[in-house]
Amino acid sequence: MIQELKSATPIAGTFYYDIISPFSYFYIKQRHRLDQRVNIQPTPILLGGLFRATDNRGPGEIEAKRPHTYQYCVWLAEKLGLPFQFPDHHPFLTVAAQRLLAQQDAQWEMVERAFEYVWVEGKDPNLSWPEFCQYLGLAADTPKPDAPETKAKLISNTEKAKADGAFGVPTLVIDGHAFWGVDTIDWALDYLDRPEMFEEVAYQHAGKIPSGL
């Protein structure tokens, strides 16, 4: 009976994202798998800032990884049956777009539209800002956010992501546990069925293995 009540009451989760990430696009298109279990709050961050804070780099910044990663994205879109188109260049700066999403306190409808503009339409918002704003349901003359409070909000979101254990996107945080990557939806679902998972000996050991280098 207790398990039934737990299943019937979604718990809170935070989803950190940046529209630069095709894997975040693939994730949000599958988030319905979690809808009955987690009330997910989309939270925009600046991925470049998170990378700097965690001494990390994205595959798009590593020449040897780019072809493999991008071709894998094409395959995954086909596998998932999702429309998908790369922008003419990638990566690109997403500061203005992420600030706008933070400023608007964007919920899922707007977040999905932002991702679709990049990964379905294949466009860089910086090159067609008025059109991007209209695509989100905003006025074409919406300015690129420059207010100190908006800048501070995006920075704060990014800092909170790091504090929550994120080092990349997409990352879903549940109960203080960070699940990174489009391939961790099943892991998150298993955790919800087995919330003591991270207290088990094997997980405790795996989380503390020292480096041999």
Annotate each PLM feature.
Residues 1-8:
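Non-catalytic pre-domain segments flanking phosphatase-related domains
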Residues 19, 23-118, 202-212:
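Structural alpha/beta surface segment adjacent to cysteine/selenocysteine redox centers
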